[in-house]
Each structure stands twice: as structure tokens, then as C-alpha cells.
Amino acid sequence: MASILELRSRIKSVNSTKKITKAQELIATSRITKAQSRVAAAKPYAEEITKVLSELASASASLDHPLLNERTDPKRAAVLVVTSDRGMCGGYNSNVLKEAEELFQLLRSEGKDPVIYVLGSKGLGYYTFRGRDLGGAWTGFSQDPGYSDAAKASRHLVDLFMAGSGSEVPAPNGEGTIEGVDELHIVYTRFVSMLTQSPEVRRMAPLEVMVSEERVELGEDMLSNGHGSSDSEPVAGYNFEPEPDKLLGALLPKYISTRIYSSLLDAAASESAARRTAMKAATDNANELVNTLSRQANQARQAQITQEISEIVGGANALASSAGSD
């Protein structure tokens, strides 16, 4: 058994660590509330742009737009993988990276070459360590993403898609060029509840379109991620100026930016929830370890006291025997 001093030193060390994990748990809890508020604040705009685009598509003479049309022979697919900038969030990053690897395998099986784009330092480190080629990376805002951050990534990805495979566009870092793609996908973590976060794959482009007798709706929109219904309510007819075809071309890139922004907000809430769960588990484990070490320290102290008493009694008996013999 370890000495009492060693046990007390370990107890002190574990208590210090417990203070850190408890503080991280409280911070993550407060950030979840903030992230959920931002998701709710972004929802009205997401709903309205979806409705307006559905009306535009219904009023348009044709749906002939690159962001809506399937490519005849897709060869390259850009995949945006959303990870965190910081660690201590349990399996948050490993789960989304695993989902991304499964998507890469699926794309390769379909004859498409995946081009990896990363949001978050953890994903960047993961692929860099393994020597994987990256189309681009954006870091520093995983916990507090802004619309400008989403728009920055979206602009490059939309340009990449509009160019198509076989054409070149400037690289996001401004150094050289990169070949265009025929599909856009995003892999992120959807916030379900404080205890459940689910890695998800969404195709950003070409956008899926559902055509009915009365109207045209965008399929698998960003409202299907748990923050609203994908069933659009009927809205009053619009008079569009300029022509619906021109407006459709102008708004579709903004729609993709909104979908990416919605995914980033979801991922931020999921990251904080995963970190809260991980830090709570670490704090609970620290409490259990402190209790175990305290019991061991008490047992060691009791054994030490018992030994000291035995030595004193033994010494007293020896002195008494010596005095009696005299």
C-alpha cells in the first residue's frame, strides 16, 4: 500500500483536476443555452428564405440552374467536415470523423473523388497527421460561428461547384488553384438533446427539388434537422421583380450559406453538450477516485496508529518485565 504522504499528494492532485473539470462543465452548460438561442434566432430567416425560394421555383419558367441540376457524370465531390477547435469533448470529433470516412468510402465506390474541406482545428490536425490532402480549412470559430464565417466557406464551395470538375478556381488560401467539383456535402453533428448528439451527412448541392402539381419545394432543407418542420405552410403569392429566374440564381447561393450556417450552429450546440457530458463524467470519476484514495489513506493511518500502539504496549511490557526481574 502507498504511504500516507503519497496518498494525500494524489488526493490533492485529483482535487485540483476536479476543479478544472467542474469549471469546464459549468462553462459548457452556459454555452449550450447561448447556442440554442442562436439556433432559434436564425430559424425565422431560414424558414422565410426557404418559402421564398419555393415560390420563386414555382413561378420560374424553368428550373434550369447549375445548383439544381444533377451532373451527368460527377467525378469529384467536396466534403465539408465540421469539427471542434478544442478538445475535452468526449467522442464528438471521433464520431463525426468516422461518419466522414464512411462518406468518403461511399463516394469512391460511386466513382467520385472526395475533396476534403475542414472546419475546426481538431479535424485539421487529424487529416494533417495522416498526410491527407485538403482542399482548404477554416479554424477559430467552432464554438461561436458567425454568418460571415459560414459565408466565407460557402462562397468558395459554391464557386467550386459552379466551375465543375475539369475547371479551376482560386484556392481558399489564395495560393494557386484547385479543380472544381460536381457535388457538395457537409458532415456535422446534429444537436438532439443535452445527452444525445448525432453525426449527420447532408448534400448541399445539387439541391434536391420536389415538384408537385401546385408548387415546387426544396427537398431536405435545413429545417429538417430537428429545429422545424420541412413541410412549408402555404404562403400568399408574390410578385417578383426582376424575373424569378434571375432572383433564383441570386438567392440559391445565399440559401446554401444559410444551410451551412444552420449546420454550424447545430454543431456548436452539440460540441458544448458533448463537452459538458465529458466534463461531468470526469468530475464524477474524480469524486470516486478521491473517495477511494481517502479510504486507503484512512486505512493506512489506522494501520500506522495500530502499529505505534503495539510498539508502545510492547515496550511497556518489556520495561515491566525488566523491573519485575530486578
Curated annotation (Swiss-Prot):
CDD domains: F1-ATPase_gamma (cd12151)
PROSITE patterns: ATPASE_GAMMA (PS00153)
InterPro entries according to UniProt: ATP_synth_F1_ATPase_gsu, ATP_synth_F1_gsu, ATP_synth_F1_gsu_CS
Entry superkingdom: Bacteria
Keywords: ATP synthesis, Cell membrane, CF(1), Hydrogen ion transport, Ion transport, Membrane, Transport
An example Gene Ontology molecular-function term: ATP binding
Record's protein name: ATP synthase gamma chain
Organism field: Rhodococcus jostii (strain RHA1)
Lineage: Bacteria, Bacillati, Actinomycetota, Actinomycetes, Mycobacteriales
